[in-house]
């Protein structure tokens, strides 16, 4: 899935480059592109370098926002569970039935609300790049070049960020499971469940689950968009 997202985004960049060349060559039909000049993605152009840096920042920013969103949504569920335990003490003994529907409804609303900003980020970022460079340089060619460079930055960095998050999160998750099965280190010492190493792996699993299940896979559509 990650590789297909990278290849798909690469095809979109090729289409973007070809369309720019076509519109620039037919400025009489498309007045906005009239006398725009040649658009190149030469690294000697400072706006291209700026676009690469800005585009490379997007996957990290997207992943960070997604990770904090998971924490806030989980926190709202913890508060709801505590409230139900307080109002219905018999839940722990099986005498009272918890309100599952409210918890699911609360989590669904929190998930949708928290993903609004990450969803808008890849949509608004190209507009910010284009009009920002256009305002600074006054050149449409430089603005389009910076926009294309930002797309390249997202593709390259996003691909490796997604791989890092999914594989790294999976490693943290499996580390906890290995301690539960009785992990033997290189010195022959066995670390069982409840050991200090296992407690550290639980912390790693807490980060690893949203890392591999939320932020990592979510970077794929961000690359394509």
UniProtKB/Swiss-Prot annotation:
It is a multi-pass membrane protein. Keywords: Cell inner membrane, Cell membrane, Hydrogen ion transport, Ion transport, Magnesium, Membrane, Translocase, Transmembrane, Transmembrane helix, Transport. Homodimer. This is Pyrophosphate-energized proton pump 1. The keyword Transcription does not apply. GO terms for cellular component: plasma membrane. It is an enzyme of class 7 (translocase). The chain crosses the membrane at residues 5-25, 47-67, 116-136, 143-163. Its EC number is 7.1.3.1. Its main location: membrane. Proton pump that utilizes the energy of pyrophosphate hydrolysis as the driving force for proton movement across the membrane. Generates a proton motive force. The keyword Translocase applies. It catalyses: diphosphate + H2O + H(+)(in) = 2 phosphate + 2 H(+)(out). Its cofactor is Mg(2+). InterPro entries: PPase-energised_H-pump (IPR004131). Belongs to the H(+)-translocating pyrophosphatase (TC 3.A.10) family. Pfam families: H_PPase (PF03030). The lineage of its organism: Bacteria, Pseudomonadati, Pseudomonadota, Alphaproteobacteria, Hyphomicrobiales. It is found in: Cell inner membrane. GO terms for molecular function: diphosphate hydrolysis-driven proton transmembrane transporter activity; inorganic diphosphate phosphatase activity.
């Amino acid at each position: 899935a990650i590789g297909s997202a990278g290849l798909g985004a690469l095809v979109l960049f090729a289409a973007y480059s070809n369309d720019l060349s076509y519109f620039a060559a037919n400025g009489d039909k498309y007045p906005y592109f009239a006398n725009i000049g040649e658009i190149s993605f030469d690294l000697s152009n400072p706006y291209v370098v700026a676009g690469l840096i800005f585009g490379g920042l997007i996957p990290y920013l997207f992943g960070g926002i997604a990770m904090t969103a998971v924490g806030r949504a989980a926190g709202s569920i913890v508060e709801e569970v505590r409230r139900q335990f307080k109002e219905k003490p018999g839940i722990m003994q099986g005498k009272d039935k918890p309100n599952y529907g409210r918890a699911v409804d609360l989590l669904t609303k929190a998930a949708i609300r928290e993903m609004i900003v990450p969803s808008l980020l890849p949509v608004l970022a190209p507009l910010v790049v284009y009009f920002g460079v256009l305002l600074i340089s006054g050149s449409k060619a430089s603005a389009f070049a910076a926009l294309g460079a930002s797309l390249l930055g997202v593709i390259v960095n996003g691909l490796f960020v997604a791989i890092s998050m999914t594989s790294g999160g999976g490693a943290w998750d499996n580390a906890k499971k290995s301690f539960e099965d009785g992990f033997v280190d290189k010195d022959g010492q066995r670390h069982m469940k409840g050991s200090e190493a296992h407690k550290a792996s639980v912390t790693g699993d807490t980060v690893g689950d949203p890392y591999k299940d939320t932020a990592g896979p979510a970077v794929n559509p961000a690359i394509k968009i």
